[in-house]
């Protein structure tokens, strides 16, 4: 399918290693029916970690472009490595994107990768979005994470109480606000 420039969005995923960037890519591809089953890092079957070394180490080493087609738009998602030994990959991706999506977990919260991602985006003058992963794990604290983000990134994060998430079998917490 052909796209005009108005129908293409380029975003990069940022965050610490293990915060769910590659898993989010898998979910996007699965939800849009680009793949028929979710890949797993432990099995070496994720779309974005295709290199033999990435499969062996079970983490991203280089950035991968994941094309996602949704609602007559093309979303080019750049899945960046989470370990900052590979920060050059992140800096390169910021040159071609419209925005960044910072991933963090509901269990671990705001870590070094979250802060560095925020700083990279701010320095590049790019808007940031946040994605809180692993909400279904024991001791996940989604409301506390939202409030912590509001405090830590007070000048750049808005409408945190209007957030919502979709998860099979879970209720939308934004209904309680």
Task: Describe the predicted segments one by one.
Residues 157-177:
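Alpha-helical transmembrane helix bundles of large polytopic membrane transport and channel proteins
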Residues 42-43, 118, 164-168:
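Residue-level signal for alpha-helical context at structural boundaries
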Residues 67, 134, 163-164:
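Residue-level "edge-of-site" marker
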Residues 48-52, 117, 173-174:
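Short amphipathic alpha-helical patches
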Residues 1-104, 108-110, 154, 158-160:
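P-loop NTPase switch module centered on the Walker A-proximal segment
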């Amino acid at each position: 399918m052909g796209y005009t420039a108005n129908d293409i969005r380029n975003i990069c995923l940022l965050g610490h290693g293990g915060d769910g960037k590659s898993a989010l890519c898998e979910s996007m591809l699965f939800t849009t029916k680009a793949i028929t089953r979710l890949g797993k890092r432990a099995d070496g079957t994720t779309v974005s970690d295709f290199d033999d070394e990435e499969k062996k180490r079970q983490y991203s080493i280089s950035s991968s472009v994941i094309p996602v087609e949704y609602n007559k738009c093309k979303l080019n998602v750049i899945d960046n490595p989470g370990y900052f030994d590979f920060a050059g990959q992140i800096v390169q991706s910021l040159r071609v994107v419209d925005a960044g999506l910072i991933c963090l977990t509901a269990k671990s919260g705001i870590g070094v990768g979250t802060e560095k991602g925020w700083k990279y985006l701010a320095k590049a003058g790019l808007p940031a979005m946040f994605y809180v992963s692993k909400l279904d794990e024991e001791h996940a604290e989604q409301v506390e994470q939202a409030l912590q983000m509001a405090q830590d990134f007070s000048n750049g994060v808005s409408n945190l109480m209007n957030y919502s998430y979709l998860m099979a079998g879970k209720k939308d917490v934004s209904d309680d606000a």
